[in-house]
């Protein structure tokens, strides 16, 4: 149950991050914070840096959630191999996204890099969606098994 909640929260955070990233890109504020990882004003940004800084903060939080999801998935005794692989790929993609995000800023929003950043984000989203799908399947399987054992117990009592 915890893995189901964690993976869904991670996917929701990732969706929010992609939404914010789209806004950053479309509104042209991608270089308002031209240094990485901090803005020129230091740890707490001034108003003109707030949108880009917010994107970076949500990215850091989302990356931690992706890594936590992987850790709990790998630790799970009932998670299938496909779920574990998807969580590993998602974690690798998240680390790649952080690195690529820094390179995008350093290279001043080079179009190819921005496009690759979007593409890798879609891979990350797909892998997390797969992890969520698996986690919902796990909870359905548990309910099915509980019903099945309950039915078996009641039939042996008759």
Descriptions of predicted regions:
Residues 1-158:
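Polytopic transmembrane helical bundles with strong interfacial aromatic enrichment
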């Amino acid at each position: 149950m915890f893995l189901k909640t964690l993976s869904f929260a991670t996917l929701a955070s990732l969706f929010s991050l992609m939404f914010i990233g789209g806004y950053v890109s479309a509104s042209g504020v991608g270089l308002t914070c031209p240094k990485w990882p901090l803005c020129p004003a230091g740890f707490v940004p001034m108003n003109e840096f707030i949108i880009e800084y917010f994107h970076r903060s949500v990215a850091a939080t989302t990356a931690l959630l992706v890594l936590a999801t992987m850790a709990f998935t790998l630790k799970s005794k009932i998670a299938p191999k496909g779920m574990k692989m998807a969580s590993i790929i998602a974690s690798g993609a998240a680390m790649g996204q952080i690195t690529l995000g820094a390179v995008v800023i350093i290279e001043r929003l080079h179009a190819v890099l921005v496009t690759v950043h979007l593409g890798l984000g879609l891979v990350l989203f797909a892998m997390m969606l797969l992890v969520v799908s698996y986690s919902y399947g796990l909870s359905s399987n548990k309910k099915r098994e509980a019903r099945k054992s309950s039915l078996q117990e009641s039939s042996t009592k008759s």
